[in-house]
Amino acid sequence: KEVVVTKEVVKEIPKEVVVTKEVVKEVPKEIVVTKEVVKEVPVTTTEVVVADLDPGELVIYSGRKESLVGAIIEEFENLTGVDVQVKYGKTFPVATMILEEGDNSPADIYYAQDPGGVGFLAAEGRLVTLPEDITGAVADWAKPADGSWVGISGRARVLVHTATLTDLPSSCEDLTDAKWKGKLGWAPTNSSFQTMITGMRTMWGEDKTRQWLSDMMANDVTVYPKNTPQVAAAAAEEISIGLVNHYYLHRFISESGDSFNARNLFLSDGGPCSLVMVSGAGIVDTGKNRANAEKFLRFMTSKVAQQYFTGQIYEYPVLAGDHGVKTHMLLPSLEDLNKPDLSMEDLSDLTGTQVIFRDLGMLD
């Protein structure tokens, strides 16, 4: 702004005031003129703002549901300004889509519900080796040795059962007992169930696994399309027990309260039905936004994202060392679970499991 004085001339000089005829008092940060009219004349100024560089985009192919991961992906987008596009679907079909698209696939990130999906894509050579600062943040049990992908959150297999049920099984083998005939549920097309059976093949071998599956079918196990309806069916006493991931029950309880008529049983025998697996993600080799893909994985393995998965989705953290991320108070700690000693590589052969399922008519 300029200062214009009528009749008298006031000239402002740094640290000194010169006045003709009249007396001017200097007051910090303002000028007081005696007997004179002062006009403020607006002066046009130009402010130059240097815009940030375009943060770019990121394309995610997700086998995890939007209801589970949409909020945390949106948080990444808000924090970074990256334009994120997500294609949602089932884990194995999404992986197959990337293979079919070949070099033309727009996917930068493949985000799978379980180790089988990312393990499958890694075996096909479609995932790059991740930087050590990304893999180093994740615990050894939650990632493969070759660094092709990392676990994002931990999920335990459980038996969800009607809350009033007291005579509970203690292992997978118990479920083939005649007393459970017509009272069991499973979801053969669900990739988490397929991953559990893949681990069973590693632990028991092909023959015993096939026999267990056949015995379960002979016990009139009810087939469901996914985990959620099994939890609802157990609560409604349509079945007594379902084979699911642990966190689905807590979503029902959060909506219906503690009176919801179902509970989880974490088997303590260390067998296949007590498996703890991970959702996982890797960078697709043909992706065009590598830097943003790495930024996304760093975010998803940060304490902020890990606390989202534990606090909002009731899953387990996968970080290495003393990370300080709290497991939800409704869950047993990861250290208290007697999970089988299986590597992520042991859980990758979903294709072999699907062959067995087709042979037995489980995917019809």
Which role fits each region the language model picked out?
Residues 105-110, 128-158, 173, 183-186:
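A structural signal for short loop-to-beta-strand junctions that line the ligand-binding cleft
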Residues 182-191, 299-323:
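Periplasmic-binding protein-like
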Residues 189, 202-267:
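Ligand-binding pocket segment of bilobal, Venus flytrap-like solute-binding proteins
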Residues 174-194, 199-201:
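Short loop->beta-strand "edge-of-pocket" segments that line small-molecule binding or catalytic clefts
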